[in-house]
Amino acid sequence: MARGINKVILVGNLGNDPDTKYTQAGMAITRVSLATTSMRKDRDGNNQERTEWHRVVFFGKLGEIAGEYLRKGSQVYVEGELRYDKYTGQDGVEKYSTDIVANEMQMLGGRGEGGGGGMGGDRPQRSAPRQQGGGGGQGGGGYGGGGGGGGQDYAPRRQQPAQQQSAPPMDDFADDDIPF
């Protein structure tokens, strides 16, 4: 029987500083609010902006990294999965929550925007990601891990070396042979 897919990809800005707490076993749990903004046209052709707020949770090593390096306003790429929880509040009423449990994170923006490399400590360095299209300076800092179970300690993801591709072979024909 086929399994389902539960995958969320977000690029947005933090609406608050991360809130990091530790379990009794020492595992980090970091929570942030992430804002994503989309544009669409209304019936009259005017652009309408809509901002959605997402609750994102990071576990383990990924939680430690998020808590240490992310700040309010930081732009971040997050991959994870939706999780719906039901709990009883302090007032005795059943409550529901929807969170994104992150398993991968990429800090975006320059150093002044909360992302980027060059910070000291035990943080593994990573070269800047490949850029598609124009310029812009996206900083490094891609990390994976953080599933949220069993108190596992997740290691930072290491960038795989880019595969070298040779140029395609040149065909043996002259420009005059092209029919247009």
From Swiss-Prot:
Keyword flag DNA damage: yes
Entry keywords, A to Z: DNA damage, DNA recombination, DNA repair, DNA replication, DNA-binding
Compositionally biased spans, kind Low complexity: 157-169
Subunit-level organization: Homotetramer.
Top-level taxon in the UniProt lineage: Bacteria
Residue stretches of biased makeup (Gly residues): 109-121, 132-152
Intervals of motif Important for interaction with partner proteins: 175-180
PANTHER family: SINGLE-STRANDED DNA-BINDING PROTEIN
SUPFAM superfamilies: Nucleic acid-binding proteins (SSF50249)
BP terms from Gene Ontology: DNA recombination; DNA repair; DNA replication
GO molecular function: single-stranded DNA binding
UniProt function note: Plays an important role in DNA replication, recombination and repair. Binds to ssDNA and to an array of partner proteins to recruit them to their sites of action during DNA metabolism.
Name assigned to this protein: Single-stranded DNA-binding protein
Gene3D superfamilies registered for this protein in UniProt: Nucleic acid-binding proteins
SSB domain location: 5-109
Listed GO CC annotations: nucleoid
Pfam families: SSB
